[in-house]
């Protein structure tokens, strides 16, 4: 077991923006890495002077913390430049990595900063979290013992992009903390050194003497004896000092013991006689049987003996003596129980006012009865009280008679004058009570009469009020009935108007439904026709292609004709598609117009509810006229469309017939062409291109003339049909207007009468 060496400790007094933040104390692991710890300790104390390379004091005082990374570490120790590029060790420049034994496995560890392997200078860092990735790269040589909150405060400072804190975190002062035990040892060493110096001085004196008397041996022996004597004296003095110390200690102990004894004497002592101490009771809780009866008999005998000693044989017992009482007059009262009488005093005149004749128990009963009577009188409200009071007095009178008899028996010495006075008092009391009862009854009768009168008045008033209320109710009821009748008549009129509107709406809806059905049928027929025409066109194109292939062998002229025919057909189809598109656009516009009319009708209906019935009727007439006109227009348009379709179908039949004739003609031409093939070959050899051009030009002129004629015919037929439809519409409108005029005349008369 080796002696545990005390680890060195250093401190930093830190200021943030020149305001003291606190002290941080470090413990250095000098047993693990002594060289690194010595470097840090000397830089804290500043005892090594200036550096060799930096030429600045090797001291951490007024040094900055130049790098702060939250949740990682706090770095400082660059005393030369203050930005992490400077610093120097006490050994000059850098020194090697000493030991990686201690790991970065916890927070608040003190470790050396470096630029790589074996580049330790003066810069250090304090970890704020475990950093195991630094193990094997940085030497851990200490830890923070106190001041962790100061390190946290430095860590929480705001920094720039280079992790430099905006606030100035500076080490105000630093140094080494020396424990007290070391200080005491150093003082002892100093004392020893001083004593050794004194002894050396004495030795020097003796040596000088010996040098002076070196010639004689006697002087040497004398010096030796002197030194021995001094040692003996020193020993004696030390022994005396020890003895004196022991005596002082003993004297102190004796003084303390004496003071304790005085305190004990001053305290009061309790004196108890041994006779007074009761005997310790026996444990009888385990005894199953009851104790013997002999003891009980002995106790009874002892009690009897004590009573005999207290009461001699001639004297009466104590219980009887206690019962004997003496009155004021000196009479002895004998008997048991409480006293029921007493002797009257000699002076009756005084006693009359002081005390009553009745004994105390009778007085208590009387007071109880009086209380009950008073309370019953207060509680009774209705009816007469005279009978009840008389019954109570009759009940109480025998009690009073008994009282008199008892007093007559017991007080024989009472005089007749006193009896007369008592009778007078009783009579006066009875008369007074009767008078009170009579007064109370009379007052109650008066009150009852007044109440009856008030009730009668209130009843008469209530009857008059009820009559007036009933009249008001009747009048209100009549008014309400009149209002109801009016409202019912108005409601009926309104319902009639609504029914008419509903009928008109239903008619309009039916017409619209029929129109929509017709339109859907027309669209279906159109789509079918379109599909049929497409299929026909495809067949025709296929036939025309096959014909063209046959004709191209020797008939360029016939090919040009077929092309012109196909072009004319395409143009006619385009014209049809245009007309179809126009019809569709017109139908869309018509649908929009119908939707707008529906919206206007909805608004007009909401207005009609507010407006009077006369205006609503006039609006209904206008709407009917508009609906009739629109329906006539639709019918005329539908007729025109049907006619146009019939014409188109006829024209298509004609074209098909003409095409069939042309096919027959082309077949006959094919037979003739075989005979004249030699002549045509010769013509082709002469000028084939010129002949083809001439034939194509002629065909184009003919086809254009035919198309123009067909277009003029179609236009003229459409115009005639439009004129006819317009004339029919005008006739129909005139007829409807006449009908509406006939129908509207009674409605206007009704409005005038209303």
UniProtKB/Swiss-Prot annotation:
PPIase that catalyzes the cis-trans isomerization of proline imidic peptide bonds in oligopeptides and may therefore assist protein folding. May be implicated in the folding, transport, and assembly of proteins. May play an important role in the regulation of pre-mRNA splicing. Residues 687-698 have a biased composition (Polar residues). The keyword Endoplasmic reticulum does not apply. It comes from the Eukaryota. Inhibited by cyclosporin A (CsA). It comes from Homo sapiens (Human). Ubiquitous. There is a cross-link at residues 392, 693 (Glycyl lysine isopeptide (Lys-Gly) (interchain with G-Cter in SUMO2)). This is Peptidyl-prolyl cis-trans isomerase G. It catalyses: [protein]-peptidylproline (omega=180) = [protein]-peptidylproline (omega=0). GO terms for cellular component: cytoplasm; cytosol; nuclear matrix; nuclear speck; nucleoplasm; nucleus. Its EC number is 5.2.1.8. Its main location: nucleus. Residues 194-216 have a biased composition (Low complexity). Keywords: Isomerase, Isopeptide bond, Nucleus, Phosphoprotein, Rotamase, Ubl conjugation. Residues 182-193, 228-253, 329-347, 450-462, 616-627 have a biased composition (Basic residues). It is found in: Nucleus matrix; Nucleus speckle. GO terms for biological process: protein folding; RNA splicing. Residues 292-310, 348-368, 379-449, 463-553, 578-599, 628-686, 707-754 have a biased composition (Basic and acidic residues).
């Amino acid at each position: 077991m080796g002696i545990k060496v005390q680890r060195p400790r250093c401190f930093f007094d830190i200021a943030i923006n020149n305001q003291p933040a606190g002290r941080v104390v470090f413990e250095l692991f000098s047993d693990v890495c002594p060289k690194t710890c010595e470097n840090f300790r000397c830089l804290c104390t500043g005892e090594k002077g200036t550096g060799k390379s930096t030429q600045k004091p090797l001291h951490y005082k007024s040094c900055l913390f130049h790098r702060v990374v939250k949740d990682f570490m706090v770095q400082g120790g660059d005393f030369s430049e203050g930005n992490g590029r400077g610093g120097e060790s006490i050994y000059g420049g850098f020194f090697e990595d000493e030991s990686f034994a201690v790991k970065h496995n916890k927070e608040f560890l003190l470790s050396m900063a470096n630029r790589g392997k074996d580049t330790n200078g003066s810069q250090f860092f304090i970890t704020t979290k475990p950093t195991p990735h630094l193990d094997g790269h940085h030497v851990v040589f200490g830890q923070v013992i106190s001041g962790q909150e100061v390190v946290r405060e430095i860590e929480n400072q705001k920094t720039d992009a280079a992790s430099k804190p905006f606030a100035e975190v500076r080490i105000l002062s630093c140094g080494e903390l020396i424990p007290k035990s070391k200080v005491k040892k150093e003082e002892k060493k100093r004392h020893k050194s001083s004593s050794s110096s004194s002894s050396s001085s004495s030795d020097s004196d003796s040596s000088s003497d010996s040098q002076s008397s070196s010639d004689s041996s006697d002087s040497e022996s004398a010096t030796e004896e002197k030194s021995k004597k001094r040692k003996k004296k020193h020993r004696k003095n030390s022994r005396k000092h020890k003895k004196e110390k022991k005596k002082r200690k003993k004297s102190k102990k004796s003084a303390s013991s004496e003071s304790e004894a005085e305190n004990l004497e001053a305290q009061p002592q309790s004196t108890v006689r041994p006779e007074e101490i009761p005997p310790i009771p026996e444990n009888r809780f385990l005894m199953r049987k009851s104790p013997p009866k002999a003891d009980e008999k002995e106790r009874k005998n002892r009690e009897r003996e004590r009573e005999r000693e207290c009461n001699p044989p001639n004297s009466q017992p104590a219980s009887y003596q206690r019962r004997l009482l003496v009155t004021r007059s000196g009479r002895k009262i004998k008997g048991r129980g409480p006293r029921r009488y007493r002797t009257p005093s000699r002076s009756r005149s005084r006693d009359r006012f002081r005390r009553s004749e009745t004994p105390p128990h009778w007085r208590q009963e009387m007071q109880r009865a009086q209380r009950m009577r008073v309370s019953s009188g207060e509680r009774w409200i209705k009816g007469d009280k005279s009978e009840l009071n008389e019954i109570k007095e009759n009940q109480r009178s025998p009690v009073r008679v008994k009282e008199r008899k008892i007093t007559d028996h017991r007080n024989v010495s009472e005089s007749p004058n006193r009896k007369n006075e008592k009778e007078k008092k009783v009579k006066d009391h009875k008369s007074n009570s009767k008078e009170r009862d009579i007064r109370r009854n009379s007052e109650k009768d008066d009150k009852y009469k007044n109440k009856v009168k008030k009730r009668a008045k209130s009843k008469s008033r209530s009857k008059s009020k009820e009559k007036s209320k009933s009249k008001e109710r009747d009048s209100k009821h009549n008014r309400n009935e009149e209002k109801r009748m009016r409202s019912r008549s108005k409601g009926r009129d309104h319902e009639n108007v609504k029914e008419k509107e509903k009928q008109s709406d239903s008619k309009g809806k039916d017409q619209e439904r029929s129109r929509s059905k017709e339109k859907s049928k027309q669209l279906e027929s159109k789509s079918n026709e379109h599909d049929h025409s497409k299929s026909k066109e495809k067949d025709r194109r296929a036939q025309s292609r096959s014909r063209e292939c046959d004709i191209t062998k020797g008939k360029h002229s016939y090919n040009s004709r077929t092309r012109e025919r196909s072009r004319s057909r395409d143009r006619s189809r385009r014209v049809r598609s245009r007309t179809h598109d126009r019809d569709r656009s017109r139908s869309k516009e018509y649908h929009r117009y119908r939707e707008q009319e529906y919206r206007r009708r909805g608004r007009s209906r909401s207005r009609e509810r507010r407006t009077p019935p006369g205006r609503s009727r006039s609006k209904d007439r206008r709407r009917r006229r508009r609906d009739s006109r629109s329906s006539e227009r639709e019918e005329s348009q539908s007729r025109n469309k049907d006619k146009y379709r019939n014409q188109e179908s006829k024209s298509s039949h004609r074209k098909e017939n003409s095409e069939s004739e042309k096919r027959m003609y082309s077949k006959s031409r094919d037979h003739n062409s075989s005979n004249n093939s030699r002549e045509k070959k010769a013509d082709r050899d002469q000028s084939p291109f010129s002949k083809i051009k001439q034939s194509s030009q002629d065909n184009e002129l003919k086809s254009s003339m035919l198309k123009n004629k067909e277009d003029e015919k179609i236009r003229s037929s459409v115009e005639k049909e439009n004129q006819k439809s317009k004339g029919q519409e005008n006739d129909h409108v005139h007829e409807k207007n006449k009908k509406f005029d006939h129908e509207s005349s009674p409605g206007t008369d009704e409005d005038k009468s209303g």
